[in-house]
Amino acid sequence: MSRFHLPLAAAVVLVSCLWSANALVRPDGVGKLPALGWNSWNAFGCDIDDAKIMTAAKEIVNLGLKDLGYEYINIDDCWSVKSGRDKTTKRIVPDPAKFPDGIAGVADRIHDLGLKVGIYSSAGLTTCAGYPASLGYEEIDAQTFAEWGIDYLKYDNCGVPSNWTDAYTFCVPDPGSASTNGTCPDNENPAPQGYDWSTSLTAQRHQRMRDALLGVEHTIFYSLCEWGQADVSAWGNATGNSWRMSGDITPSWDRIAAIANENSFLLNHVDFWGHSDPDMLEVGNGDLTLAENRAHFALWAAMKSPLIIGTALDGIDPAHLEILLNKYLIAFHQDPVIGRPAYPYKWGYSPDWTFDPAHPAEYWSGPSSTLDGTLVLMLNSEGSRQTRTAVWKEIPELKDALGRKGRRQTGFRVTDVWTGKDLGCVRDHYTVTLESHDVAALLVGKGC
């Protein structure tokens, strides 16, 4: 068992779990369910200030997103003075031109709205945009963030000095660095068989901040952003509340499909207290079609990934807002009784268990206590209109269901998750025609 600083040592425990070796469990419940919120980076990059952050916070409330559970307003990179830390206190200094009331002032106003606030740093000497980062200053920064009232830390992997670079290279099977079966044949520096990546320098850099956060009296959700490096799925759950499993997302279907494919092979690590993070949402960004926006959100929700909105909320397209406000998908995502995500039960376009960045698994299912039924997704990963059919006897949660006379149940009440329409008693299967890159989302309920 890891050793933690005394203030929270008795309040935070590492417990053995089926889905991972360990998990961070807090008595206040922070981190049990995947995070819901908003982040500044995908919308604004470095062009942030007090006004933009507060506008996002107010829109989370005004648009009804807060009512569904969206709660974190996260300030990403570029919030501090770039020239360096305070020479006396060694603290990171908020940029007074961007945040005249400091980060604490913003946090106070966000808290007044009934929301929580997040901040950004990196496990290196500088952030990805070249601002002061936290390696070597973990305890100072954790204490500073706690005093400011910070509730969430996104912790990146930039600015790493050579003496903190891993001895080996882990295979992150992103397109461009992997073969079609998810391996990295060109990796010239693989770890020896049986190597424990939780002892790697990447893991140690992130564990140092974990210990510092656990040493303060204020709970801070810890989001690891290490891009899937160093086999983070094996140690992320003992280090943070969520962990990035790949490189960055972009507002393009090719990238969204590739990340969904990659994450579909990592879902055995996901349950209460620990969530694999396929990066922030791009709903509302770029040239994604409405179908692609829907599929992106549905897959992220079904995988119980953090749902962190990444678009400007003032002036958001009503159709995109409707996606973010889908009460069925949020209810599945925030289930307080069932922690496991939906899993692929059939790949569809490709043979089962095929690692294909262009065509992720198309058929997904997962049980839900909040919906009192099973969530079923059918994806069209192809570039043209196609039909997809969900066959009840193929779905793990439904295939063994018994009717009143002990016979296999063949009919179920079905609801269209996108429209809320009751589709009635559907027997044996349900077929739908989908536009390119769209997804059908069904709630399959009681037998009939």
Curated annotation (Swiss-Prot):
Its EC number is 3.2.1.22. The keyword Secreted applies. Glycans are attached at N163, N181, N237. The active site is at D156, D248. CDD domains: GH27 (cd14792). InterPro entries: Aldolase_TIM, Glyco_hydro_27, Glyco_hydro_27/36_CS, Glyco_hydro_b, Glycoside_hydrolase_SF, Melibiase_C. The keyword Glycoprotein applies. One of its GO terms (molecular function) is alpha-galactosidase activity. It catalyses: Hydrolysis of terminal, non-reducing alpha-D-galactose residues in alpha-D-galactosides, including galactose oligosaccharides, galactomannans and galactolipids. Pfam families: Melibiase_2, Melibiase_C. Disulfide bonds join C46-C78, C128-C158. It is found in: Secreted. GO terms for biological process: carbohydrate metabolic process. It is an enzyme of class 3 (hydrolase). Residues 1-23 form the signal peptide. Keywords: Disulfide bond, Glycoprotein, Glycosidase, Hydrolase, Secreted, Signal. Substrate binds at E226, W227, G228, Q229, A230. GO terms for cellular component: extracellular region. Belongs to the glycosyl hydrolase 27 family. Hydrolyzes a variety of simple alpha-D-galactoside as well as more complex molecules such as oligosaccharides and polysaccharides. This is Probable alpha-galactosidase B.
